[in-house]
A protein has these predicted regions:
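Amphipathic alpha-helical dimerization/coiled-coil segments
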Residues: 1-19, 92-108
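Intrinsic disorder/low-complexity segments enriched in polar/small residues
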Residues: 3, 58, 63-64, 79
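Alpha-helical residues within the helix-turn-helix
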Residues: 51, 62, 68-69
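N-terminal helix-turn-helix DNA-binding core of bacterial DNA-binding proteins
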Residues: 11-58, 78, 82-90
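A generic alpha-helix structural signal
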Residues: 21-24, 64, 95
Length: 108
């Protein structure tokens, strides 16, 4: 049985390949993927993320730094807290696709 073909123009992809590869590298770390999934639910601060994901603060800070440097999250300071949000709506689509493909339908 043949797999369905996708309508992909290799020349168009060539121009976007660098950005696509950068995005995939960001997502290729379990902690960063979980962080992005949490942030995709709405703007949140470090303490909220730490509580929700049980990722220890040093790891959390390191991975949030990578996300900031790659430009995939926006930051906003309010008092002592820094709030994070997803910078690129396309990333939300990628996260939704990953969730749909890899998370069992019976789980919330």
């Amino acid at each position: 049985m043949k797999s369905p073909k996708l309508a992909i123009d290799p020349e168009k992809l060539r121009g976007a390949a660098g950005k696509a590869v950068s995005t995939m590298k960001v997502l290729a770390n379990e902690d960063r993927l979980l962080l992005l999934c949490q942030i995709s639910q709405g703007e949140c601060c470090v303490s909220e993320i730490e509580e929700q994901l049980d990722i220890h603060q040093p790891t959390l800070s390191q991975q949030l730094g990578v996300l900031r440097n790659e430009g995939v999250v926006n930051t906003r300071r309010q008092g002592k807290n820094i709030y994070y949000s997803i910078a690129d709506p396309a990333l939300l689509e990628i996260l939704a696709t990953l969730y749909r493909l890899y998370c069992p339908k019976g789980n919330a």
